[in-house]
Regions:
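Non-catalytic, solvent-exposed segments at the cell envelope interface
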Residues: 2-324
Length: 324
């Protein structure tokens, strides 16, 4: 890790994104959307499994001498935890849009700027998503970096250095130690990953009361309803100079509208009722998510799917970890 990266641990300087708070808000919303993607994606797995199982069972034929059959796959027993992190990294397809952040000495650094602990309870199933501030000063345990070298434990460092020191596993170890919760599953996503998922479902609809013309992001949109994806989606999420009084409040309003629209579309019949779209979404998720080995097991995915398939969207609650 470079000295520059260490110096910027608590500040993500994203080009024209001049406020670190705005970047943190953006990444948090992106990670929250990915929590929805994971839950919805698991729902997709449940849909395929149950549809396949019901179809095969309806046409099955009993054979003599086969009383002892393998047990059915059941839902994951008990509650479980999943860590989801949004990482701030300079991806080749998007780095040209982030100015100094991705052209200077900080370009090689990767920080876990968004950190979520997703808890799925025992029956009755409920989902609680706890958000941890990136600059939360806490102990960081000793971890192994990508070269297999052990990093020294630190008594008080911002949470967002954990990924740099030891990747996804170090983030999990840090959050597990902080909360005294065992974590069974984990995944990370980049900014570009969320954009690719938006593309996979054909974009999301946003409605503008007034036109937006922002020379900083290059966004030029008329008033009314638009379906945004790709670069335009990225511009829409970043713009603030062309919205309202140019403050971060306008940007946050855009982001909330975008993420709400994304979440609604993910759980709508337009996605969950469309097999080709679901397959494309699943494939895009595989390509854009870094997961723990426990999430690489198809049977485990089915078990998780069966555990959460009936949780209504209103029973997914988001809270922030308290800071002193």
């Amino acid at each position: 890790m470079s000295d520059n990266t260490r110096r910027r641990r608590t500040v993500a300087r994203h080009g024209q994104l001049r406020s670190p708070g705005a970047v943190s808000q953006l990444l948090r919303l992106l990670a929250i959307s990915m929590a929805v993607v994971l839950v919805s994606g698991i729902g997709v797995a449940a849909y395929f499994y149950l549809d396949f199982s019901n179809t095969v069972s309806a046409n099955a034929v009993d054979l003599d001498g086969q009383e002892d059959l393998p047990p059915d796959i059941g839902a994951y027993k008990g509650g479980f935890n999943l860590v989801l992190t949004g990482v701030d990294t300079c991806e080749d397809d998007y780095k040209q849009y982030f100015g100094d952040r991705c052209t200077g000495g900080d370009a090689e650094g990767t920080l876990n700027d968004v950190n979520l602990l997703v808890h799925v309870s025992e029956e009755p199933r409920r989902i609680t998503v706890v958000s941890f501030p990136r600059d939360l000063m806490i102990p960081i345990p000793s971890c192994e970096d990508e070269d297999g070298n052990a990093t020294a434990a630190m008594s008080k460092q911002p949470l967002n250095v954990a990924y740099t020191d030891g990747g996804l596993n170090c983030v999990v170890r840090t959050i597990s130690s902080l909360t005294d919760q065992e974590v069974q599953f984990a995944a990370s996503v980049t900014f570009g990953g969320v954009i690719e998922i938006t593309n996979a479902i054909g974009g999301v609809d946003v409605c503008l009361a007034n036109p937006i013309r922002d020379r900083y992001t290059g966004l030029d949109m008329s008033a009314g309803t638009h379906t945004v994806k790709g670069l335009e989606a990225l511009q829409f999420l970043r713009t603030r100079h062309g919205v309202g009084d140019g403050s971060d409040l306008g940007r946050i309003g855009n982001q909330q509208q975008y993420m709400s629209s994304l979440a609604r579309k993910l759980i709508s019949g337009e996605v969950l009722g469309n097999v080709p779209v679901m397959l494309k979404l699943a494939n895009t998720g595989i390509q854009n998510l870094e997961t723990s080995t426990s999430l690489a097991d198809p049977m485990m995915i089915v078990q998780i799917a069966l555990a959460v398939k009936s949780v209504p969207f209103e029973d997914i609650v988001f809270v922030q970890y308290p800071t002193l």
